[in-house]
Amino acid sequence: MAAAPPSADPLDKALIVDVDQWIEQLYECKPLSENQVKTLCEKAKEILEKEPNVQEVRCPVTVCGDVHGQFHDLMELFKMGGKSPDTNYLFMGDYVDRGYYSVETVSLLVCLKIRYKDRVTLLRGNHESRQITQVYGFYDECLRKYGNSNVWKYFTDLFDCFPLTALVDGQIFCLHGGLSPSIDTLDHIRALDRIQEVPHEGPMCDLLWSDPDDRGGWGISPRGAGYTFGQDISETFNHSNGLTLISRAHQLVMEGYNWSHDRNVVTVFSAPNYCYRCGNQAAMVELDDDLKYSFLQFDPAPRRGEPHVTRRTPDYFL
């Protein structure tokens, strides 16, 4: 007798039961065991490595920016935006570092991805990298919570598989950072080999590191990676690719969202009171069936018994 064809969905019934239990546990901010994280990352890799560099997303969708390990504020985001999978979510990267709950935050988002893969899109941010996480907190948090670096390794290996960008209904282009002088078209992005550590330079690096700027043309980025790009660049890119908007994250904005380049670009930031001290609001963008947008702003969740903030790491863009 011929063997049954492999299921298109890598989740079997037993794993669905496990993942549902993990999600329930993580909603209580209780980390998974090291072995559970290993299984989680193996299953997520099967899904994420098949996704293209420009992931097609249908509206309605709610688009979110950086969350940076601020787990209780992610709960606030879900309270405002709706629970998964009722709401279709697109996150534009930077799940880890800076906040105190990177492990729980990224574990939950990856669980939701494998459980509801067509209702959750996870893009790669510049912090989804081995080098950056060793400086800004995720590596140290993994050592503290697990006693070794295995969980950090499982996740940073998985980060190599995250798609770089998304395209909502062919019109709204979503990514973490910004544009690149090496990239004129979405087809250029589709042709990149993304399954690797974030390079120090080049088009993949630029997509995760660049920022819009008031000055025209391309400029040297003060971050030491990526570029700054002016309104002329955004307008040309949008026109050439039939886009109405570039939605990106990567920069703290005090209202949670900020228009630039004559509404060719919007920045969305979803970590309120960033680093537990910046005093900013957070936001997400709801795109309805007709791609009409509304911004949902939210404040930080009440904090109970969180560790005292110490400033140990350099602030490369505060």
From Swiss-Prot:
The keyword Secreted does not apply. Its cofactor is Mn(2+). GO terms for cellular component: axon; axonal growth cone; centrosome; cytoplasm; cytosol; neuronal cell body; perikaryon; protein phosphatase type 2A complex. It catalyses: O-phospho-L-seryl-[protein] + H2O = L-seryl-[protein] + phosphate; O-phospho-L-threonyl-[protein] + H2O = L-threonyl-[protein] + phosphate. Disruption phenotype: RNAi-mediated knockdown causes severe embryonic lethality. Causes a failure to duplicate centrioles resulting in the formation of monopolar spindles at the 2-cell embryonic stage, a failure to align chromosomes at the metaphase plate, delayed cell cycle progression and defects in mitotic exit including failure to reform nuclei and decondense chromatin. Also causes a reduction in centrosomal microtubules. In addition, recruitment of sas-6 to centriole is impaired and sas-5 and zyg-1 protein levels are reduced. Few of the surviving animals show occasional defects in vulva induction. It is found in: Perikaryon; Cell projection, Axon; Cytoplasm, Cytoskeleton, Microtubule organizing center, Centrosome; Cytoplasm. The keyword Ribosomal protein does not apply. InterPro entries: Calcineurin-like_PHP_ApaH, Metallo-depent_PP-like, PPA2-like, Ser/Thr-sp_prot-phosphatase. Keywords: Cell projection, Cytoplasm, Cytoskeleton, Hydrolase, Manganese, Metal-binding, Protein phosphatase. It is an enzyme of class 3 (hydrolase). Binds 2 manganese ions per subunit. Gene3D superfamilies: 3.60.21.10. Mn(2+) 1 binds at residues 66, 68, 94. Belongs to the PPP phosphatase family. PP-1 subfamily. Part of a complex consisting of a common heterodimeric core enzyme, composed of catalytic subunit let-92 and constant regulatory subunit paa-1, that associates with a variety of regulatory subunits which confer distinct properties to the holoenzyme. Interacts with szy-20 and regulatory subunit sur-6. Interacts with regulatory subunit rsa-1. May interact with sas-5. Interacts with unc-51 and unc-14. This is Serine/threonine-protein phosphatase 2A catalytic subunit.
